[in-house]
Amino acid sequence: MTVVFDAEPLLAFSFDEQGAGEVERWLDQVYDGELDGYVSTINLAEFRYIAAREASGEQADAHINDLREMGVSEYNIDGLWEYASDLKATYSPSIGDAYAVAAAKDLDSNDQQRNVTLLVGAVDDYDVFEDTEGFVHLIERFRDQSA
């Protein structure tokens, strides 16, 4: 089983926002080896700049190191640019969210059992994917309201 993290859940966990406990449950499963955990490199960049604004660049990097130590791996998205741009053109999510969906779909296409989850927050960019064939099984929200 695999989980792909959007930036929002990782920020919620790192800054103890609403829903942090739910994200911690997912991260514990990654740490324990029960799940493979990924974050796309663009979502990691999003995490870093927001965390740096909230705290500092040093703290942002410390949070990223903690996530790596828990077993969260960076998912290289270089080969997904065409698919992400198609998602952006068709469904209009932010570019970071388009890449998160593209990464989850890429992992899902290589998983015979379709056990890939994209963990997201309350952002409405994912609403359309929850109602679209081929994506609905991927999306799971850790909270229903923004922090």
Placement of each model-derived feature along the sequence:
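Short, well-structured N-terminal submotif of metal-dependent ribonuclease cores
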Residues: 1-39, 52-62
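Acidic, PIN/NYN-like endoribonuclease modules and their adjacent C-terminal/linker elements
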Residues: 2, 73, 101, 109-147
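Conserved glycosyltransferase catalytic-site signature
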Residues: 7, 41, 97-101
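A generic structural signal for short hydrophobic patches within well-formed alpha-helices
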Residues: 10-11, 44, 126
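Acidic catalytic patch
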Residues: 37, 70-90
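Helix-adjacent hinge/juxtasegments
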Residues: 51-77
